[in-house]
Amino acid sequence: MSRGPSSAVLPSALGSRKLGPRSLSCLSDLDGGVALEPRACRPPGSPGRAPPPTPAPSGCDPRLRPIILRRARSLPSSPERRQKAAGAPGAACRPGCSQKLRVRFADALGLELAQVKVFNAGDDPSVPLHVLSRLAINSDLCCSSQDLEFTLHCLVPDFPPPVEAADFGERLQRQLVCLERVTCSDLGISGTVRVCNVAFEKQVAVRYTFSGWRSTHEAVARWRGPAGPEGTEDVFTFGFPVPPFLLELGSRVHFAVRYQVAGAEYWDNNDHRDYSLTCRNHALHMPRGECEESWIHFI
């Protein structure tokens, strides 16, 4: 008669044996004959001895081969890979190490070895007039023993200084903005504007053109300080550059002044005629002795 798993009878020896707490001394006895080599502790990432080499596989195991093959040294590296290697944190050579320099030609990277530019000998170079005038000054200064006389192209205002007019105060009260004076130099055109102090927040700008108002530009003026009795007026300064091609005889610059305050806009355009400057010849005379001791060579 067969018995199921629940009816299995254990030996009496196992049933009468009591299990006590397991002692770990037996494990220590097993390792007692093996002397462990002490290991030195060091923080991770610190320099030290290299790890021991991996033991070679046994004769039964097949020899392992790397999946990724190393690139041949004769192959040129791509520009992207070379840039990444140059920008890597560890790419810089440390002191005392030797770094070999390699030369690569443009054709190895798919580029052209030469760049050809064709010039037509019949085309005359376009030299600005102000450059030619300065070259003529230097040649006259070196080859002549007489006094130096030359002409320069410069912008000259077509109007007298408004601040010197007798009705300047009346115009200022009527327009709330009025141009004081304007000056020209190699750096461009600059000037001052006076406005009535209507409110604290205000803005002054100069709108100018080199093409007869076909295209316009604006230069924002900066506050310089108060003026007038008890600070009822303010003075602003402005400036804008002049391109070299404009320094030709007859070329003109037109501009007007705009004043924005308290949500309103006011203009000073020289009584609807605009302020203008014209490029004209300006004659200069300088004795020979003063030329040799001056900075005329650097004009």
Swiss-Prot record:
Role according to the record: Seems to act as a glycogen-targeting subunit for PP1. PP1 is essential for cell division, and participates in the regulation of glycogen metabolism, muscle contractility and protein synthesis.
Species per Swiss-Prot/TrEMBL record: Homo sapiens
Keywords: Carbohydrate metabolism, Glycogen metabolism, Phosphoprotein
Region (Disordered): 1-22, 37-94
Record-linked InterPro entries: CBM21_dom, CBM21_dom_sf, Pase-1_reg-su_3B/C/D_met, PP1_regulatory_subunit_3
Single biological process term from Gene Ontology: regulation of glycogen biosynthetic process
Entry annotated with the keyword Phosphoprotein: yes
Highest taxon above the source species: Eukaryota
Any single GO CC term annotated in Swiss-Prot or TrEMBL for this entry: protein phosphatase type 1 complex
Gene: PPP1R3D
Reported tissue expression: Expressed in all tissues tested. High expression in skeletal muscle and heart.
Pfam family, one: CBM_21
Keyword Phosphoprotein: yes
Residue ranges occupied by any CBM21 domain in the UniProt entry: 169-278
Subunit structure: Interacts with PPP1CC catalytic subunit of PP1, and associates with glycogen. Interacts with EPM2A; in the presence of NHLC1/malin the interaction leads to PPP1R3D ubiquitination and autophagic degradation.
Modification Phosphoserine occurs at: S23, S25, S28, S74, S133
Name used for this protein in its record: Protein phosphatase 1 regulatory subunit 3D
Motif PP1-binding motif per UniProt: ranges: 101-104
GO terms for MF: glycogen binding; protein phosphatase 1 binding; protein serine/threonine phosphatase activity
Compositional bias annotation for Low complexity: 57-67, 85-94
Comment block on domains: The CBM21 domain is known to be involved in the localization to glycogen and is characteristic of some regulatory subunit of phosphatase complexes.
